[in-house]
């Protein structure tokens, strides 16, 4: 069995344009299982600020729920491309990092990565860095796996699972075909679909 593992290429947290009204509560929207409940409890104990923590599965799910306006979020943790989209739509607020003691300890390379979607580093704070890869059971797959091509090998039909991520579903075939992961060419995107 093959498993495509993907951790978000780059995840940033940003302050949404729709803040909650309660000054003693911070409403956070993040991927499921990304922050342990004990961390939230420790934060509440140390600061006296209550955390209302909401989870989502994919950035697209997050976007749909956010845009519905049902809940106003103070902090949203999502992927790089979604931060950029929401900035372009005016849905993100600038973050004052001067009061964040740890901000000066963030390695410059991560702040530089953020500049790809937040050129002035004013809207997002680096949160997670991840990767995409292939995990496989060596008892089932005997040959060495060193290429994305194994995903299209007929002998492994119905034995491959992939994370529920629209972006990753396109990223893998684009990468395999030597196409930029950020292409906007309809021809290249259709090639990735086939």
Describe these PLM feature segments.
Residues 14, 18-86:
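Early extracytoplasmic/lumenal segment of secretory-pathway proteins
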């Amino acid at each position: 069995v093959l498993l495509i593992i993907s951790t978000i290429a780059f995840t940033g947290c940003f302050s949404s344009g729709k803040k909650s009204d309660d000054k003693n509560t911070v409403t956070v929207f993040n991927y499921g299982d990304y922050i342990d409940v004990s961390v939230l409890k420790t934060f509440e104990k140390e600061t006296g600020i209550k955390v209302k923590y909401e989870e989502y599965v994919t950035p697209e799910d997050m976007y749909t729920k956010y845009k519905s306006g049902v809940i106003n979020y103070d902090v949203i943790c999502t992927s790089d491309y979604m931060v950029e989209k929401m900035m372009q739509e005016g849905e993100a607020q600038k973050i004052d990092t001067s009061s964040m003691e740890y901000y000066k300890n963030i390695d410059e390379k991560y702040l530089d990565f953020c500049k790809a979607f937040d050129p002035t580093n004013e809207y997002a704070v680096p949160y997670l860095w991840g990767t995409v890869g292939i995990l496989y059971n060596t008892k089932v797959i005997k040959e060495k796996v060193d290429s994305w091509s194994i995903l299209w090998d007929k002998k492994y039909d119905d034995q491959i699972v992939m994370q529920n991520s629209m972006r990753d579903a396109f990223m893998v075939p684009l990468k395999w075909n030597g196409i930029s992961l950020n292409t906007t060419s309809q021809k290249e995107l259709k090639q990735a679909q086939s």
